[in-house]
From Swiss-Prot:
Family note: Belongs to the Maf family.
InterPro entries: ITPase-like_fam, Maf-like
Designated name of the protein: Nucleoside triphosphate pyrophosphatase
Protein's organism: Campylobacter jejuni subsp. jejuni serotype O:6 (strain 81116 / NCTC 11828)
Entry annotation: catalytic residues: D71
Length: 183
């Protein structure tokens, strides 16, 4: 059995859909790291920090188990977009995407008793212009909350994606194909 060390509903749904036996363990992480580095390095550091925090707090309860740590960020060019703190920040992030593109970087660390596997994947989504009413509803109803870069591929954004380069599961927060290869 896999232990998903994350409160992410999207990641849990991806594992269920892939028929991977898992148990979800929610944990509050401090994800505040310096964003003045490459987005690729940033998302990897976040995953390693999640592992450190989880193991320092709950490690003794999960010895010799298969643990999965993951994180996703959105970047536009080299600008890192994490989770919006409020509606103002959500509108700013969405304005950067409107009629343009955004890349989702998803990293995971699979810790097994016999090995560690680290994966970094990228999916780029290209958007047509957002409908102003749909955008307002999305933000004002707080649907952006908890979403890296305010991107909701399975909701608001799906109506505006013109094409994508990369796997949808990566955009949803976890590269399932790569994970399955190492389970």
């Amino acid at each position: 059995m896999l232990i998903l060390a994350s409160s992410s509903i999207s990641r849990a749904n991806l594992l269920k859909t892939a028929k991977i036996d898992f148990r979800q363990v929610s944990f509050d992480y401090d994800e505040n790291l310096d964003k003045n580095i490459s987005p690729f390095l940033y998302v990897q550091k976040i995953v390693l920090e999640k592992e450190r925090q989880f193991l320092s707090t709950l490690g003794k309860d999960f010895q010799n188990q298969n643990l999965l740590f993951a994180d996703s960020i959105v970047c536009i060019d080299e600008k890192i977009l994490t989770k919006a703190k409020d509606k103002k920040e959500a509108y700013e992030m969405l304005a950067l995407q409107n009629g343009k593109y955004a890349s989702i970087l998803s990293a995971f660390l699979l810790v097994k008793p016999e090995k560690r596997v680290f994966s970094l994947s990228k999916t780029t989504l290209y958007f047509k212009n957002f409908d102003e009413n749909a955008l307002r509803d999305y933000v004002e109803n707080d649907l952006y909350k908890g979403k890296a870069g305010c991107i909701m591929c399975e909701g608001f954004h799906q109506n505006f994606i013109t094409h994508q380069v990369g796997n949808l599961s990566t955009a949803l927060g976890l590269d399932i194909q790569t994970l399955k290869a190492y389970l």
